[in-house]
Amino acid sequence: MTTESKCPFKHAAAGGGVSNRDWWPNQLNLKVLHQHSSKSDPMDTDFDYAQAFKRLDLAAVKQDLLALMTTSQDWWPADFGHYGPLFIRMAWHSAGTYRTGDGRGGAGAGQQRFAPLNSWPDNANLDKARRLLWPIKQKYGRNISWADLMILTGNVALESMGFKTFGFAGGRKDVWEPEEDVYWGSETTWLGDQRYTGDRDLENPLAAVQMGLIYVNPEGPNGNPDPIAAARDIRETFARMAMNDEETVALIAGGHSFGKTHGAGPAPTWGPEPEAAGIEEQGLGWSSRFGTGKGTDAITSGLEVTWTTTPTQWSNNFFQNLFGYEWELTKSPAGAHQWVAKDAAETIPDAHDPSAKHLPTMLTTDLSLRFDPAYEKISRRFYEHPEQFADAFARAWFKLTHRDMGPRARYLGPEVPAEALIWQDPIPAVDHKLIDTQDIAALKARILASGLSVSQLVSTAWASASTFRGSDMRGGANGARIRLAPQKDWEANQPAQLAKVLETLESIQGAFNGAQSGGKKVSLADLIVLAGCAGVEQAAKNAGHAVEVPFTPGRMDAAQAQTDVESFAVLEPIADGFRNYQKGKYTLPAEALLVDKAQLLTLTAPEMTVLVGGLRVLDTNIGQTRHGVFTQRPESLTNDFFVNLLDMGTEWKATDGRDVFEGRDRATGALKWTGTRVDLVFGSHSQLRALAEVYGSADAQAKFVRDFVAAWDKVMNLDRFDLA
């Protein structure tokens, strides 16, 4: 017998082999609700990153980064003797995965370190950038996260080349595993583009045009070197990143004012990406067999373009070249489509040979800024007014690198800009004395005596708070934006009922505030949440349980002028399984949309389960449909949803294309209940059924109420960053 045959693991170690997902690829995936647990986090349980960052000597870090910029390493030499352009690309690509559709992606968790992003074709050779940073990360340790360090390095890179940045905020906390909740597309090959249908309609929520790209194909759509067609892709992709035309032009031109692309030779000379590379590569990828594989011989995108005569110094030369020459199509040494200036002198410096010069070159997507009429108008203004260009780029860069951080309350450090920006969803600071315990009790009594039902109170508070997205920290009850456009008109918020509830609560607010002295007030944002808490307490009382739902005042009311209607439109629920709502019919089944919503609310599977069961019996369905209201005691916080769902005396059959179901008595055939896929999944999915059985047991009523209250409190406070 050979040594190999004695190995007890014939085929795979723990976690190997055929998975449940392989057997049942359409199985509802609950793992996305249990990411980033303490079991994957190496930090101490009491570690507070915000406090650690506050102890950081940011000026010292920046000095070390500044020295790094011009300390070229033989193993990966700096172009033009300066790593700044490489680090700008690293920071840009860290932040640039953000998309507005679901708020996922972005720089907030340092995901560029992990698959798939660390191995995307568009991130080729950024592994070297992070390795160059390791000595600085090692020096400052846990006081600065990788997520913060990558963005800070991009800022220092810009500053080291003469550009004045708008500011920097820390506060991005690292995670320790890939984010499994982000849908990057269904393509199974790099640079695939099955995400398009019809007349180049891009699948939501995606923003990038091809699998493995951050934004658009720099050669043009699918490699077609058409600047006008490329402009269409640029406009859609950048809009899905929350950028308007001016911000888009500023970012492209600003970023391409520095450095170069790399296409010294044919891409087939590349080795595998980091995740596929051999163990001896130690996490590095794209080892090239072309020449030395680095410096003059480096290959990254396959394009070989240097935009300006000042690749390591801020200037207006990008626009000077863009408008100063006519351009003709050519190919890089790697065979990629790019453009070269006609009738031009060789004015562009070589990245590694001080004696060599090159002709000006541009990408197809650069020429879009000249030949698309709207982009051209902005570009020409920037060309003629460099100070406007510098300001626009500084602001757009700050937005790009901070968009997924949420409100300013999360910003840390001495370089946080004083100016509040509309895209930060500003909320006024608390400017009055807050209500106390006695006030809270008195307000609850007024609310419960107002004639509003438990259902109305709970529904309104849920609608206000559940807009929160843990992906980009937007939404939530703070600000009371449910009373403003666009939220007040969303179908999911039942505008007619909402107006009635708000009118009643505003009356209570006015009476209370008018009777106070000493500057004490209650905001409508607080009152909406307090009303929901009062509704939950009353529902528990109706079921025979005396509970006090936690409530902490301190929310404020935003103004319409502080609310970007277009920006907030992306928060509108297309589905909310917690309220048995779908705006339309979608490719994804309703239960998958429920899990997606739960993940954005940072809920676990047990929390999702108890909230659905509780909200059903509290009669909070949008439109007051009876689907899933498995109780004869609505507005009582009972575990009836689970008891009746698990009742084997009920037989379920589809009635409407397998989206709506009838539950009939097995013996008599009499109709007992109706339910949706979201309701029935808690009986059909083995994990969810196991949770439903906990709450459907005879001894579970008290636990059910406790767990519902805890999960409710969590959702109501998701945006209370002041309480963290």
Curated annotation (Swiss-Prot):
Role: Bifunctional enzyme with both catalase and broad-spectrum peroxidase activity.
Broad enzyme group: oxidoreductase
This one is known as Catalase-peroxidase
PTM comment: Formation of the three residue Trp-Tyr-Met cross-link is important for the catalase, but not the peroxidase activity of the enzyme.
**Which gene underlies this protein?**
katG
Q: Which residues form the active site?
A: H93 (proton acceptor)
Subunit details: Homodimer or homotetramer.
**SUPFAM superfamilies per record:** Heme-dependent peroxidases
Q: What is a single cellular component term in the Gene Ontology annotation?
A: cytosol
Catalytic reactions of this protein: H2O2 + AH2 = A + 2 H2O; 2 H2O2 = O2 + 2 H2O
The cofactor named in the record is: heme b
This entry's Enzyme Commission designation comes to: 1.11.1.21
Cofactor annotation comment:
Binds 1 heme b (iron(II)-protoporphyrin IX) group per dimer.
- Which family is this sequence assigned to? Belongs to the peroxidase family. Peroxidase/catalase subfamily.
One Pfam family from the record: peroxidase
Q: Give any GO molecular function from the UniProt entry.
A: heme binding
At what sequence positions does the UniProt record place the cross-link Tryptophyl-tyrosyl-methioninium (Tyr-Met) (with W-92)?
Answer: Y215-M241
